[in-house]
Amino acid sequence: MSASEVKAFIQHIAPIIRAEADKRGYKICSTVIAQAIIEGRYGTSTLAKVYFNHFGLKCGSSWRGKSVNMKTKEDYGAGLVNIRDNFRVYDNDFEGVAGYYDFISTKRYANLKFAADYRQYAEYLKADGYATSKSYVTTLCDCVIKHNLYTWDDTDVTGMFFPKCSPDHTSIVQALDEIGVDSSKSYRKKIYNVNFSDTYLFSARQNTAMLALLKDGMLLKP
């Protein structure tokens, strides 16, 4: 998809999700937007585009609405396997988003209302059994960071980032020291892991990437 198409999808679905989250009393919705992006492939999957199910919601035993049988992949511990299953069908995106919140409005997912941030929301989803993918939490968090989706959360996002450092710095260690943050290798690794998905090897490229975010005031705290 083009950058403009990605932006258009987020601008369309995010306000719908935020409005429904407000109605239901959820502060965090960035992870839900990320779910719509990942599960529905930016609204282009058949399930999302035709059936307005952006979240891969299966019917289960309690669903009494319309359904469609489709192929899907699941990870039961030995890698992805292809299966067929019945999925919920909605008439429009508003119903689809409301359906997601209906789905999580059970005792099983009760902890989601108390998630402090997008990462904890993703961790709760995985722990509650929403998805089988081992990388589900990382995938969602990477998506939130990539598209700055945390700006849609009902939280003080300014407290999520380190303050800007001087633009003249060429060393991440010196930059962290300047703003009074622990610059040890162990803490830098924690910082990197929150902001990037690859393994931190203390390379010059990785340190430069962290420094660039810090200069912009966009380096997330661990």
Model-identified regions with their sequence ranges:
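Catalytic cores of secreted/periplasmic lytic hydrolases that degrade extracellular macromolecules
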Residues: 1-160
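Residues at alpha-helix termini
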Residues: 24, 128, 147, 179, ...
